[in-house]
From Swiss-Prot:
Protein name as annotated: UDP-N-acetylglucosamine 1-carboxyvinyltransferase
Described function: Cell wall formation. Adds enolpyruvyl to UDP-N-acetylglucosamine.
GO biological process: cell division; cell wall organization; peptidoglycan biosynthetic process; regulation of cell shape; UDP-N-acetylgalactosamine biosynthetic process
A Pfam family the protein falls into: EPSP_synthase
Source organism of the structure: Rickettsia rickettsii (strain Sheila Smith)
Any one cellular-component term (Gene Ontology): cytoplasm
Residues annotated to bind UDP-N-acetyl-alpha-D-glucosamine: R95, K164, V165, S166, V167, D308, I330
Keyword DNA damage annotated: no
Amino acid sequence: MHKLIIHGGTPLKGSINISGAKNAVLPIMAASILTDKLHITNVPKLTDVSTMKDLLRSHGADIEIIKHQDEFELIIDTKNINNFTADYEIVRKMRASIWVLGPLLTKYGKAKVSLPGGCAIGARQVDLHIAVLKAMGAEIEIEDGYINASSKGRLKGTHFVFDKVSVGATINAILVAVLAEGETVLFNCGREPEIVDLCNCLITMGADIAGIGTSEITIKGKDSLNKASYKVLSDRIEAGTYMFAAAITKGDVKICGIDYHIVENIALKLIETGIKVVPINNGVQVTYEGKLNSVDLETNPYPGFATDLQAQFMSLMTLSSGVSMITENIFENRFMHVPELCRMGADIVVRGNKAVVRGVEMLKGAEVMASDLRASVSLILAGLSTNSKTVLHRIYHLDRGFQDLEKKLSNCGADIKRV
């Protein structure tokens, strides 16, 4: 099994190009089921993307892959979909597999999808997915670990209020409603840029969607959708991760290929800590200027601070000049990186959904283990900040969500290699 060897102590300097967004491309790939052909560009090279390709192929899709140096293009032909079951062996690898449920059901009237896996950070129940589908007329049973869904004729538009904000359920509801009969109005929706990107792709395919980027989305169902070509937006979580990497190594890095407005809340939080952050053409520049203040943080649905960046921010706060309180409001089990950071000398105490971080002068290299995707990269950031050697195990988590991470960091001076 591979591991990463990190020799820290070098400030990162240079530029990093941001890849396509994992959390946008996966639902867009699922949306290909709604039409006959979808051409997607700026596709990142990630294992989760490979898993979604395998899943779509298992349903009968034909996928052409055009490889470029830094990205893929995918041409997904779904006119011969002939299998409506998403098997456990594929679905267990990735929770995003649940997003084929809506498209299969709304277009073909039936779907059987294994209850998803792929993540250790919380229960992330599918109750809201099921509730909105039932509200649109679907008949659903859960048997032997599978969601069995069917409909008699087209699903019907409805008015539906999500009990709590759910990115995943918002996506599935949108994917269903674009082919449902009549008008659907969804309340308390997720507002994430990746949801906006999915909606923009669906509009390119001929969907009628209003209220994009707000908590109230109105969709008028169409009889069918068109072939289309679409470029996926850049990954704000990857961008934020490298912004924190620049800060924790006392570096100066240009983050390129990202719209400033979708990382502005990250930039503002960094500015609070004393880091200089300025917009540049097609990106943002992050510069350490000699101080790192402790700052409190709460994760919340967008436009709040992303839970997917909480672990990286915590790594930064371990070296701050005071005490910070980090509150995790999205997932109940997202402090699994804390024991590993403490192995490196961090002073962190967890109380429920809150972590109290007392800054220390320096972290120390150690052998540590990744527990999930975002926790793994937080340990890399911690390792880069030390003046010693860190060994990170179970790095297969990284490949689910970060393309060419070692290469991008090495190009900015980091001593990091996979063995």
